[in-house]
Amino acid sequence: TEWLNQRLHVGHWLSCRLHDAAYEMTRTLSVRCRRYQELANLYEKAVTMCAIHARICIMAWKPILPTHSHMVGHLYQRAEEAINAEAGLLDSGTEEEISLRKEAMECGKLAYQVLSDICGLYGVVDFNKKI
């Protein structure tokens, strides 16, 4: 965690902790009360719009999961979606927006590579290939 603390701004670290706590709270409440189910759905959408969480997830899970597992592919897909969503909130053409788009594109390429390799191993047809 010392390395992680050096890499992340304190505000981002606290933001992640708060997001986790809020997620647990809304999840337990949504089980008990239908009214909170909408709140839980909104929270899920809000979390996907945070690029820093995508990076933390990759740093945390990538060393643990097998390199060519579908979970790693889906992890990269989620990261791509989150980073693209955050880039969409910024003004078009800014340096930060362009940087986020490049990072999202890299995650998308990695996701495609991992998932298409898995499909090839199991003989699943790739519908994107031209016949």
Which functions belong to the PLM regions below?
Residues T1-I131:
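Extended alpha-helical scaffold/coiled-coil
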